[in-house]
Structure formats: C-alpha cells, structure tokens
C-alpha cells in the first residue's frame, strides 16, 4: 500500500471451517504437496474483487516506472448485494420514495398480465432467457474480457456488463479449446473440462447450462430451479422445486410413472432425476458439485472422455461393459460399449475403482467422494470393498484427494460399523509422509481384521481379496498410470 492506493493480497492459506484449521491452498486447489508454496498468492484487486463484491472499480493506476502496478480500488458493496442482479437502482429508489408511486407501480401490469411491472429495475423473472441467465453467468462462468481494450477497462473502472443485457461483447466464456494467454501453460483451460467439453471445476455453471438441451429449448434458465430470496442458502433452490420437482415441472409425463422411465425403484436414488442427468462430477473447494450440463448418461461417451459415469459412480462394483449393456437393454440400441479409456487403463475392472487408482486428480477426487455417498447402489453391508479402496486414497499425493478419501471412509465406516472412526478422525491428511504412511498401514490392518470378522466376502474383481486384503498386484499398475499435472482451478 502507499499514497496511490493499496494492493490487497490473498495469502496461499485458508481457514477450513469444517476442519477448524488452516489449510494450504495447494491442498484445496488440486495440487500436489510439493508444488510451489506461493503459487496461490493472488492480488485481490485484479482477481477476487470481481465476483465477490458489487459495483467493482479496481482502479488500476499506471506507475510510469515499469514497477508493480498500483490500485485504488472501490466497491459499492462488499459481497453480493441487490445491484449485482438487479442493476443500478437509483431510478428504482427514487420511484419508490413516493407512497403514491409505489401503489401505482404495484398495480401496473406487464405484457403477461403480471402486476408490479413498473419497477424501474431489472427483474430476473421479467427478462428474456439469455438476459436472465447472464445475471448469474457474469460470475458463475469462467471468462476473459472480450478484447484487450475491455481488459484494461475491467482493471480500471470494472466490468462493462450490466444486468438486463447479455454477456456477448463483454466477455468470452472459457471452453476446453480456448487459447491460453501467455505466459500461462497451454493446457491450463483444457484441464478444467472433461474430454467432451463438460466442465469439471466449479464456477462453470453457466457454461453447463447453455450446453444443455433444456436451455436450447428456450425456456429453461437458472431461475427454473434457483431463487435468491427463499429456501436453503446452501443451494438456493426454490422450496417448491426441491428434488424431482425441479425437473417434473416441465417433464410432467415422466412424473406420472417414474419407474417406467428410470427402471429403478421409485424411492431409490436411481429414480432421482439429478443423480443421472446432473451427476456430481464437478470439483469445487473440497466439495463435489453437480454438473449443470443437463443431459443423459452415456457410458461410451463418458469413459472415452475420461469422465465419471453416473451409472458406475453408483454401481461402483461394476465395469463399463456391464453399464453399457444395461443401458442398451433398458433405453435403446444406440448405446454402445466404450472403446478405450484415455489413460489406457483396463475396461474389464470396476470403472469407478479404476478411475480412483489410475485417474488424474479430478477423477480421483470425484470418485473417492462418490464411494462414500449414502445412496450408492448397493446395501450398506456390501460396501466393505468401497471402504478398502477409499483407504488407498488416504495415501494420495494430493491433499484434497486425501481429505475427500477420509470423509468417505468415515461415512462408510459409520454404515458398516467397523469401529474405525477414531483412527480415521486422527489421520492427519496434511501431515508429511513420515507420519501418514505408518498411520495408513495401521488403518489398513485394523480394517482388514474388522471386515473379516463382520462383513460378507467382497464382490469379485473389486481389488480386495476375500480376506479383505488389498490386491496390490492389481492396484499398483493402475497407480502407475496416474497423471499428476496441476489443475488450475482459476479462483
């Protein structure tokens, strides 16, 4: 800081509320333990300020001496406030200052006959589909300024998009094939997407939305499911659109006989719309989120794109061929078996477990989190193999994968009643290998003894013997296929 303003820096650390401890961002943003300690130190004025505040003016100031740039930054509101979505509100405030004007505005009707039309402000429910979605897309989409001129404007007076408009002309949305501006690594953006172009990191919800057939139909938008003024703040889903109702408000015929469409029991997770059509395949900050690309599962497409498949994420003991054959039998001959995985791993082993051991960091994070989900497609007592494989994730080179593995292991242990909770809770995912490795060996020994005493034999082919010892001769070749590249989350 100085006379020309101040530079605010984000430290490469965060306070993790769930664990009640400081966590290095390498262990959050999908990087290995030995990566650059200061990589995630960032200038708040040129990065964080845009999506976490309202009325942003970074105020970039030239130094004239070629030194570090200076900022004189201002925001109208710290955090996301009314004008982020409703636009500049001076005219609205002045209009509603008069009781008579408020009464008249409340009675005014729009073209659809709805009251409250004369608001002098942007209402997401009263603008077109593209304009409504753009209100969310201004932040919930990774993007670049549309031109170099726009870039310098953004860094001085702020983004040029205003609610009520569209994003085109203001920003360019990132896609898998978007060129990376120098000096960035050429594959930076490509690593943020699955091989078929589906986003696999958070903050791409708008991109997924616009790729969805529902959106291309012209009616579907963010407000079809979400509301900012009601419901649970965690997901901001409209109370009357929870569960399947978000989908059946349009797909009413399916709702009349869910099992006929899903071929699963109506009360099971296999009959929940989002489990198949918006699977949890997106990595966020130590959480796995639902894809916002609404589409149908396709085993061949997903496997060949290196993308977790909704069917085998739930049926974790099944291989890709089984899933493809079931889809062809139940939903049509156009479904085929996969040709090959991008990593060259075998197709004749359980697809989810192969991704856990051979996949890249995002695949491993998504898969190990899925193993611990309560709605997995098998009885609780049959999930000992899932816990065994999740324990392997505790030895991962990426802290984020280890944390998710411990979370899943705790859930699986609670379902199986093996009594490992104390040891799992004490396992420090941030400790060095000299501490973690012996602790993991002790955990595996305790697990094996408890599982042999209390559980039925595991399914064949799940990398666990009948004695609940890991089949390391099968797992080690898969571990050798792992790709350890940096996944630039872009936050």
Set out the residue ranges of the language-model regions.
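Primarily the internal scaffold of c-type cytochrome electron-transfer domains
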Residues: 1-6, 10-12, 17-20, 24-32, ...
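Conserved hydrophobic register position within alpha-solenoid helical repeats
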Residues: 367, 405-406
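A gly/proline- and charged-residue-enriched helix-loop-helix capping module
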Residues: 27-30, 40-47, 54
């Amino acid at each position: 800081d100085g006379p020309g303003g101040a530079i605010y820096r984000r430290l490469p650390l965060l306070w993790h509320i769930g664990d009640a401890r400081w966590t290095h961002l390498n262990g959050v943003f999908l990087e290995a333990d030995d990566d650059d300690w200061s990589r995630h130190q960032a200038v708040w004025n040129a990065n964080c300020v845009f999506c976490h505040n309202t009325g942003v003016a970074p105020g970039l100031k030239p130094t004239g001496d070629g030194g570090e740039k200076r900022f004189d930054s201002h925001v109208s509101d710290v955090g996301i406030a009314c004008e982020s979505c409703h636009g500049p509100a001076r005219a609205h405030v002045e209009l509603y200052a008069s009781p008579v004007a408020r009464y008249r505005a409340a009675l005014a009707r729009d073209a659809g006959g709805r009251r409250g039309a004369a608001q002098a402000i942007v209402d997401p429910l009263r603008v077109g589909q593209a304009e409504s979605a753009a209100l969310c897309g201004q932040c919930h989409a990774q993007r670049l300024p549309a031109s170099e001129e726009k870039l310098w404007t953004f860094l001085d007076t702020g983004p040029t998009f205003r609610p009520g408009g569209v994003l085109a002309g203001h920003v360019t949305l990132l896609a898998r094939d978007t060129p990376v501006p120098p000096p960035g690594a050429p594959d930076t953006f490509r690593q943020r997407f699955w091989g078929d172009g589906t986003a696999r990191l958070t903050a791409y919800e708008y991109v997924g939305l616009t790729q969805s057939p529902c959106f291309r139909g012209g009616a579907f938008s963010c407000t079809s499911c979400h509301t900012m003024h009601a419901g649970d703040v965690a997901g901001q889903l409209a109370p009357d659109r929870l569960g399947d109702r978000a989908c059946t408000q349009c797909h009413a015929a399916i709702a009349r006989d869910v099992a006929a469409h899903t071929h699963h029991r109506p009360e099971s997770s296999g009959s929940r719309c989002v489990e198949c059509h918006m699977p949890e395949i997106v990595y966020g900050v130590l959480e796995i989120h639902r894809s916002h690309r609404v589409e149908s599962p396709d085993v061949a497409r997903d496997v060949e794109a290196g993308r977790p498949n909704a069917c085998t994420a739930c049926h974790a003991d099944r291989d890709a061929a089984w899933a493809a054959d079931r889809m062809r039998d139940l939903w049509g001959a156009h479904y085929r078996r996969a040709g090959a995985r991008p990593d060259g791993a075998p197709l004749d082993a359980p697809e989810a477990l192969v991704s856990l051991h051979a996949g890249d960091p995002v695949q491993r994070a998504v898969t190990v989190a899925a193993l611990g989900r309560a709605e997995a497609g098998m009885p609780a007592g049959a999930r000992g193999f899932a816990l065994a494989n999740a324990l392997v994730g505790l030895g991962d080179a990426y802290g984020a994968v280890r944390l998710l593995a411990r979370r899943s292991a705790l859930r699986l242990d609670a379902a199986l009643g093996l009594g490992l909770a104390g040891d799992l809770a004490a396992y420090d995912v941030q400790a060095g290998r000299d501490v973690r490795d012996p602790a993991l060996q002790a955990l595996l020994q305790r697990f094996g003894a408890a599982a042999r005493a209390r559980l039925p034999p595991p399914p064949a082919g799940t990398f666990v013997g009948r004695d609940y010892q890991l089949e390391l001769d099968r797992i080690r070749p898969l571990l050798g296929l792992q790709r350890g590249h940096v996944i630039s989350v872009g936050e």
